[in-house]
Amino acid sequence: MQEAYIVAYGRSAAAKAKQGALFHERPDDVAAKVLQGVLKRIDGKFNKNMIEDVIVGTAFPEGLQGQNIARTIALRTGLSDTVPGQTVNRYCSSGLQTIAIAANQIMAGQGDILVAGGVELMSAVPMGGNEPTNNPTLQYDDIGASYPMGLTAENIASHFDVSREDQDAYAVRSHQRAYDAQRDGRFKDEIIPIQVNSVEYTNAGPKVHTNIFDQDEFIRPDTTMEALAKLRTVFKADGTVTAGTSAPLSDGAGFVVLMSGDKVKELGVTPIARFVGYKAVGVDPKIMGIGPAYAIPEVLSLSNLSVEDIDLIELNEAFASQTIASIKEVGLDISRTNVNGGAIALGHPLGATGAMLTARLLNEMGRRPDSRYGMVTMCIGVGMGAAAIFEYVR
């Protein structure tokens, strides 16, 4: 069986939905710019038209993210029209699912060079899509399939005894870690700077300005327990979850390029990390945020590893309550988890998150010569969880 290696990675910076740097951009254009930057990072005798497929995840593949956006991205990237594209949707793990699909295809001998990643501009397609169509039977049966994500976060807080103070403290730490990382330039090598447009509205009419976007927009180093304590709960009158302990609506994109071991040798390309394993699981939709606590043991078992073997973990912070509960349930080491902050401070562009977290993980592993295994994991809407393991090549 072939091994699948990541040979390049990169992400956009994360932007505020509806008001940030990507508000005036198209999702396919943003993704194409990021992918172009990632492809430039591959050494050896690689040629972009050697790519055999472009697999792109998005949580809401409709409107500006519809029409098989993966194929559009491939063409906008400047790839040959012989390079196909497929769009994948597993909600919040879509960008990680594409990496698993590409890796498994390589391991099965069905390809040698594939692109995987994700894009989500929540500025372009709103949360829930343009026309939410929840199944009425599931809604009436009250199994949680139609619950707002914030309500499931409240359920997690109650079920796993996560206090308001615990959530606020976690959010403060996420912002502080992200601020420290940004200040120290730790995100620089994982972010692909892209050219974007901004619009200034004047009495003479709108003026378009061109800017370079390369800084995550959500980090607030001035976040304090006192400030968070003043926020009202959002999803339940007597609840504990606030906007300050939830991931903000975000825009972003991320990609990796995977290559078979044989092709790595043939082209003289430098491998970065080996794909070890991936697992997606289902959980009670009413407590969907606990998904990582079920996916992590499954992927560890599949990979013949223990939690102690994992040197770094990127656990998507959809909400502080579910992140804290998942960490406690699995027994993760907080000193190894989200070391540069997480989604509360860095955003969660849904279908792009898996690929963006993979870029963040590999970038940090590259800075730590003693790290070997890394993990990306997240909860998924409507009651699921996913986790993937990578081995850094030294």
Protein language model regions, located:
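Conserved catalytic cysteine-centered active-site region
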Residues: E25, T58-G111, P132, I143-L151, ...
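N-terminal extracellular/periplasmic Venus flytrap/periplasmic-binding protein-like
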Residues: R11-A13, H24-K33, A169-E266, E329, ...
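Active-site-proximal alpha-helical scaffold in enzymes
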Residues: N89-V119, A157-F187, F255-D262, I327, ...
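Glycine-rich loop/linker segments at domain edges
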Residues: S12-K18, N104-F160, P221, M365
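Short, well-ordered amphipathic alpha-helical segments that serve as non-catalytic structural scaffolds
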Residues: P27-D43, I69-A70, T98, M149-I156, ...
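Condensing-enzyme catalytic core mediating Claisen C-C bond formation in acyl metabolism
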Residues: M1-P27, T224-I290, Y294, S301, ...
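Conserved beta-ketoacyl condensing-enzyme motif
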Residues: L22-I113, V119-N135, I191-F213, K286-I287, ...
